[in-house]
From Swiss-Prot:
EC number: 7.1.2.2
Organism whose genome encodes this protein: Oltmannsiellopsis viridis
UniProt-listed SUPFAM superfamilies: C-terminal domain of alpha and beta subunits of F1 ATP synthase (SSF47917), N-terminal domain of alpha and beta subunits of F1 ATP synthase (SSF50615), P-loop containing nucleoside triphosphate hydrolases (SSF52540)
Encoding gene, per UniProt annotation: atpA
Protein's recorded name: ATP synthase subunit alpha, chloroplastic
Subunit-structure text: F-type ATPases have 2 components, CF(1) - the catalytic core - and CF(0) - the membrane proton channel. CF(1) has five subunits: alpha(3), beta(3), gamma(1), delta(1), epsilon(1). CF(0) has four main subunits: a, b, b' and c.
Topology term for the membrane: Peripheral membrane protein
One Pfam family here: ATP-synt_ab_N
Length: 498
């Protein structure tokens, strides 16, 4: 035992007094007085921010959404089964944020950006707020670069540009996710980072998406954010914002990103569930009054940034499900008014074996040809016109018995053009192949081919062009223009085949 000399005692006490600091750590604490259905009501939690993260006694995290006179209504990010009445709650002083970074590429994460694919932890140095302010007018640039989907019907008639928001809308089982996945597959080698957000889907459907992307070598540049149907409404509500935050990291580092929200109907339903449980007043279709703001603040984050901010972009493809093709319901009309156009998929067209089942008549891109390569502009104008005239004639020909030869010829060409737009799933086409296909259809080269054989002929034609006339593809890739030389090569190839 160490002996302390009497004269040392005073110096030790003096030393301890000098080191003593009178810091008081204030912790904002409340008490749960009601819990259930993923909602907790807390008493005594003063000085709490809207959207602040709360930590419960058992480690469960919640978000303060309702700040009322006598209590705080919070939604739980979990089952909340171990949160009990009378347990204490601590305000963290933080707003919901997630880690972001390159390490997320090729991974499957949940709505809180935690990995769920069994490939280990993700190390990330930076964090971003889940909800951040959208870029302003000055920081944006108008959409002018094409975002190729690989689908002829979309790239030719409903072109999408980098930084655009294009809604994919239609009934269930009409191929909405297929269009989104084809767009991801088509970004291979283009340096575009893709984020696929699955909201309220079956885990088996998400596993299928992961497998498809993995087999095609597209998972390396994709992040999948998953909030399955059996997860709490809070996580289904948060998932799209998490996806947007992950994409924003890449956008602000000068990269191009593509975000798919599949689908926003489920997010709105999850938000409705939360709002009703928080006893917020219901509005149309029992949705809360701010359901428009729910989607507008998410989709406004998609932008094409100006050169000072690195020229990055975020393109958003939100998906909305309709009932019996009713586009005038609440959520569809809201999202249509927020986005820069919509691709409308019809169950009738799908059942008529025309896939992708796009209703070209009411689908539109409000950016238009500004987001189209010159080569596509050169051939697509004629295609749109021919198809519009064909649709009108087809409706008329059902009533007329005897048609003149010119009308019959136009109907025959229209049927072949419709065949030309059909495309198998997971087989996006390069720009050169699309241009060659449309050129052949619009210039009458398919008129001699039987309607049933059009698709097989076009596959053969594209293979022949790529193997025997590679110069055509080179010209299109280098100049993005259908030059006279390229047109001559096309004519040669078609005359050799026919």
């Amino acid at each position: 035992m160490v002996k302390i000399q009497p004269d040392e005692i005073s110096s030790i006490i003096r030393q301890q007094i000098e080191q003593y600091s009178q810091e008081v750590k204030v912790v904002n604490v409340g008490t749960v007085f009601q819990v259930g259905d993923g909602i907790a009501r807390i008493y005594g939690l003063e000085k709490v921010m809207a959207g602040e993260l709360l930590e419960f006694e058992d480690g469960t995290v919640g978000i303060a959404l309702n700040l009322e006179a006598k209590n705080v209504g919070a939604v739980l990010m979990g089952t909340g089964l171990s949160v009990q009445e009378g347990s204490s709650v601590r305000a963290t002083g933080k707003i919901a944020q997630i880690p972001v970074g390159e390490a997320y590429l090729g991974r499957v994460v949940n709505a809180l950006a935690r990995p769920i694919d069994g490939k280990g932890e993700i190390s990330a140095d930076e964090t971003r707020l889940i909800e951040s302010v959208a870029p302003g007018i000055i920081t944006r640039r108008s959409v002018h670069e094409p975002m190729q989907t690989g689908l002829i019907s979309v790239d030719a008639m409903i072109p999408i540009g980098r930084g655009q928001r294009e809604l994919i809308i239609g009934d269930r089982q009409t191929g909405k996710t297929a269009i989104a996945l084809d767009t991801i597959l088509n970004q291979k080698g283009n340096g575009v980072i893709c984020v696929y957000v699955a909201i309220g889907q079956k885990a088996s459907s998400i596993a299928q998406v992961v497998t498809t992307l993995e087999e095609r070598g597209s998972l390396d540049y994709t992040i999948i954010v998953s909030a399955t149907a059996n997860e709490p409404a809070t996580l289904q509500y948060l998932a799209p914002y998490t996806g947007a935050a992950l994409a924003e990291y890449f956008m602000y580092t000068g990269r191009h990103t593509l975000v798919i929200y599949d689908d926003l109907t489920k997010q709105a339903q999850a938000y409705r569930e939360m709002s009703l449980l928080l006893r917020r007043p219901p509005g149309r279709e029992a949705y809360p009054g701010d359901v428009f703001y729910l989607h507008s603040r998410l989709l406004e984050r998609a932008a094409k940034l100006n050169d000072e901010l690195g020229s990055g972009s975020m393109t958003a493809l939100p998906i909305v499900e309709t009932q019996e093709g009713d586009v005038s319901a609440y959520i569809p009309t809201n999202v249509i008014s927020i986005t820069d156009g919509q691709i409308f998929l019809s169950a009738d067209i799908f059942n008529a074996n025309i896939r992708p089942a796009i209703n070209v008549g009411i689908s539109v891109s409000r950016v238009g040809s500004a987001a189209q390569p010159k080569a596509m502009k050169q051939v697509a104008g004629k295609l749109k016109l021919e198809l519009a005239q064909f649709a009108e004639l087809e409706a008329f020909s059902q009533f007329a018995s005897d048609l003149d030869q010119a009308t019959q010829n136009q109907l025959a060409r229209g049927k072949r053009l419709r065949e030309l737009l059909k495309q198998a799933q997971n087989s996006p086409l390069a720009l050169a192949d699309q241009v060659a296909t449309i050129y052949a259809g619009c210039n009458g080269y398919l008129d001699t081919v039987e309607t049933e054989e059009v698709r097989s002929f076009l596959i053969e034609f594209r293979q022949y062009l790529n193997s025997n006339k590679p110069k055509f593809g080179e010209i299109i890739r280098e100049t993005n223009t259908l030059t006279e030389e390229a047109e001559t090569i096309l004519k040669e190839a078609l005359s050799e085949l026919l």
